Amino acid sequence: MNQEYILAKEKFATIGIDTEKVMTELAEIPVSLHCWQGDDVCGFDSDGGPDGGIQTTGNYPGKANTPEELMADIEKVLSLDGGLHKLNLHASYAIFTEENKADRDTLRPEHFAPWVAFAKKHGMGIDFNPTFFSHPKAQGLTLSSPDEEIRSFWVRHGIACLKIAEYFANETGIPCVMNVWIPDGYKDIPADRIGPRARFMKSMDEILATPYDKTKVYITLESKVFGIGLESYTVGSAEFGMGYVLSRGIVPLMDNGHYHPTEMVSDKISSMLLFSEKLALHVTRAVRWDSDHVVRLDDETREIAKEIVASGRIKDIFLALDYFDASINRIAAWTAGLRNFRKALLIAMLTPNARFTELQNQGNLTELFVLQEEIKGYPWGAVYDEYCRRQGVPAGEQWYREVENYEKTVLVNRK
């Protein structure tokens, strides 16, 4: 073992932390990797880019343009992070042949068979997202549309995706999280706020009326405060989302970029866990709005991880990443965010949370404050480097050398 790790192991032992146990447990935590970082949320079922209040900025060379390129890029990222992973797909990443093209309301499992083969190759489960944007029938309102033809089209899309999600679970043997997020809303002050939300509720009820195995598919609902072009009103608000999931017995999903900048998802996790058996998270980094910057090892990322671990409910929480940055190398963006979130989980697991809780309950807030600050200087980095070595992935910044080589040999050849 590395001497730095031996010293770190001894240091953490003084506060009752077994680093060997922590590394074993960290390797067993699945993090769902979002496919859309690799191609700027473009997908394969249309020629246009993302809409619905979603915006990818930058034009760094090397964007994946085909399923084969995207899969190759994901494989590179997987090789640079140790631990369990899942693959997070949007419905817009269906892979068609000339013979089986379909619109979104008639998508079938066969359109995702190549992704299943890819996931099986890497021992991963698949999470899924109906895509209610970047489509001719997604012009402002989808599941909340007053146009019955439009609304029913998107209901059929949701039902088709539910069947595909169950297919993923059956094929991989790992439960699938199917997340619903819609971009519905208005740029300016609406005349009627309750009508669209009532229609959204009706649409969700119709999707949920489809029989499915609740041990294999977990349906989640994601809210949002606003998006570009939807500044004044968002149908799927936080209050709607919370009320709906708790009344229907599905799973709340919180994206830490989908709230007002002064709201912290880290403070919401404990409350949601008291009222819901399961919880799903999209970890991102919001800069003044839902900008989906690459996840850094910043205060909120660390606090989210701390709340996940300290809750004692980590097995009840579905963890996923959600960001997209085209201003830097996309493989580096993917990898950095993934490794940063795993570092945050490691730091949380190396924290004597039980001791800190005891001090809080004793009213010894001075010692609690001091220890919370002092532990920030503990050598968690040496533990992370040892974890990487044991997982067979590069420690430290050496992973970026592999990304540079991949760019020079693979990405540079893309148009």
Predicted regions and their residues:
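Short linear capping/connector segments at secondary-structure termini
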Residues: 183-185, 224, 323
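Acidic, His- and aromatic-enriched active-site or binding-groove loops in soluble protein domains
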Residues: 110-119, 123, 145-161, 197-213, ...
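Acidic/histidine-rich catalytic cores of soluble enzymes
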Residues: 189-300
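Aromatic- and glycine-enriched pocket-lining scaffold segments that form the walls
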Residues: 175-189
